[in-house]
């Protein structure tokens, strides 16, 4: 079957999602954001599964991808709420790092136009250096960069969900029509062989 519009579009969407997820994974690793790192890893795995299912006409894999797309949208909505401090959420907390470290988003110190300055702490001596870090001159605050990342992920996931449902319905209809004409039904072949054997036995039993 030629590559239909819906199937080709889903392949393109899965590819774009992989590129966006890998880009995001790199910066989450740099910021030690363990929660997003784990979520990105699962997203990459399931997206590859969905891409494989689309290429190999496996509707179950595409369905699994569609279910994950809905979960992925929910996760990114949470991230938007987190960075915009909706309700009791605080973007300065270490929630996304699983309270393992005090690291924040990598963009908080390395965003566009940001200048990072370190001031040593007075009266603190030791082998480890201690300093206050201040960031000034950022063209875009880091929370808005993270929100834009999540918004892009939501857009791609919603489109992927819609096309995954469409492609699944197309695959299912094709399987049903193939079953209807006996494509996967072993009975016709068995029936022909049984009839041939019956005729052979009948011929050998005739008197000479």
Curated annotation (Swiss-Prot):
Keywords associated with the record: Cell membrane, Membrane, Transmembrane, Transmembrane helix
Leader sequence residues: none
Transmembrane segments: 10-30, 35-55, 62-82, 151-171
Cell location: Cell membrane
InterPro entries, per database record: Na/K-Atpase_Interacting
Membrane topology designation: Multi-pass membrane protein
Domain of life per record: Eukaryota
GO biological process: regulation of sodium ion transport
UniProt subunit comment: Interacts with atp1b1 C-terminus.
Protein name: Sodium/potassium-transporting ATPase subunit beta-1-interacting protein 4
Organism: Xenopus laevis (African clawed frog)
């Amino acid at each position: 079957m030629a590559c239909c519009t819906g199937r080709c579009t889903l392949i393109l969407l899965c590819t774009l999602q992989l590129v966006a997820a890998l880009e995001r994974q790199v910066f989450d690793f740099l910021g030690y954001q363990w929660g997003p790192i784990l979520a990105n890893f699962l997203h990459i795995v399931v997206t590859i599964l969905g891409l494989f299912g689309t290429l190999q006409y496996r509707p179950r894999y595409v369905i699994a991808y569609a279910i994950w797309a809905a979960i992925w949208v929910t996760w990114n909505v949470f991230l938007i709420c987190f960075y915009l401090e909706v309700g009791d959420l605080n973007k300065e907390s270490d929630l996304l790092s699983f309270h393992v470290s005090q690291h924040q988003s990598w963009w908080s110190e390395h965003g566009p136009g940001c200048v990072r300055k370190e001031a040593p702490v007075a009266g603190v001596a030791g082998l480890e250096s201690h300093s206050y870090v201040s960031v000034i001159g950022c063209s875009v605050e880091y929370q808005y960069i993270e929100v834009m990342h999540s918004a892009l992920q939501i857009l791609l996931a919603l489109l992927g969900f819609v096309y995954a449902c469409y492609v699944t319905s197309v695959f299912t209809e094709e399987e049903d029509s193939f079953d209807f004409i006996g494509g996967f039904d072993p009975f016709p072949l068995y029936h022909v062989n049984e009839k041939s054997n019956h005729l052979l036995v009948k011929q050998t039993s005739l008197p000479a």
